[in-house]
């Protein structure tokens, strides 16, 4: 009799333990923003939901600016951004009675890519700037035979567009004939199909297109070593075009948003950063 009661008790405890472990957090979380961070946010959402099956997470891109606007308007819980939030966006948030909370969550290197057939071996930051501002229009000006340069970049809603303009172009305007595309994937695809093209994409996309585009080492200037965007070079910021990737919330996060960001910064969440192809923040 006692053995039967003990067995039933143990069974009940086992059920309670399994229920407690499987419960996790619940609710619906909306994440929106950076196209660069889209595969990363999807990876985090997938891994988080495995641990918290009662949580529903919606992840969409559209661009960093789109995500931050959605956060300000209250239509998303977390905005992903490949650039720091701008003062005017903080002011807009304050007008809605909150201050955005910033979370650096990963590190990225913006890879400069060309068609695999292009014989160019490397570029300086100045040369990249001159290409994208229109001072250099033909590959022959750089000593190689690849014809007319077709500059490809993102659209104005993109955080990468703005970061590249500020960090590489030093605030100068993009060349008028640049092909502006709505996604990083579209840039990589275009460069892979056009022998004269050059583009800029997040390192995770460069890795996924490894056999279709050629990643160029970049140097800080003439006479300085050209650095390939390896994980170590990006982490140490030796690679010239490195940056942090961010998540933003409406003030200090609570509930499901806090649980998600705690997961993002955990060893498991940072392992997801490496899995996707970016560089862990810690």
Q: Which residues fall in each region the model found?
A:
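Exported/periplasmic ABC-transporter solute-binding proteins
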Residues: 18-282
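Bacterial N-terminal signal peptides that target proteins for export
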Residues: 1-9
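Bacterial N-terminal signal peptides
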Residues: 9-17
């Amino acid at each position: 009799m006692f053995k039967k009661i003990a067995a039933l008790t143990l069974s009940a405890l086992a059920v309670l333990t399994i229920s407690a472990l499987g419960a996790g957090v619940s609710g619906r979380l909306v994440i929106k923003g950076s196209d660069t961070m889209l595969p990363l946010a999807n990876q985090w959402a997938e891994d988080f939901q495995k641990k918290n099956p009662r949580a529903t997470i919606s992840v969409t891109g559209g661009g960093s600016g789109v995500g931050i606007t959605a956060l300000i308007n209250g239509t998303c819980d977390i905005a992903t951004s490949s650039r720091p939030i701008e003062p005017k966006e903080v002011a807009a948030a304050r007008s809605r009675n909150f201050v955005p909370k910033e979370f650096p969550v990963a590190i990225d290197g913006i890879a400069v890519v060309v068609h695999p057939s292009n014989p160019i071996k490397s570029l300086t930051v100045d040369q990249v700037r001159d290409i994208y501002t229109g001072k250099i229009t033909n590959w022959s000006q750089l000593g190689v035979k690849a014809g007319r340069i077709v500059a490809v970049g993102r659209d104005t809603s993109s955080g990468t567009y703005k970061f590249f303009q500020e960090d590489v172009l030093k605030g100068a305007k993009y060349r008028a004939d640049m092909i502006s595309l709505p996604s990083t994937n579209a840039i990589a695809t275009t460069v892979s199909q056009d022998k004269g093209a050059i583009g800029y994409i997040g390192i995770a996309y460069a890795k996924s297109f490894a056999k279709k585009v050629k990643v160029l080492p970049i140097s800080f200037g003439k006479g300085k070593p050209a650095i390939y965007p390896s994980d170590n070079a990006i982490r140490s910021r030796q690679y010239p075009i490195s940056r942090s990737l961010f998540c933003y919330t409406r003030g200090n996060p609570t509930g499901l948003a806090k649980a998600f960001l705690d997961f993002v910064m955990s060893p498991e969440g940072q392992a997801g950063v490496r899995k996707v192809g970016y560089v862990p923040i810690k």
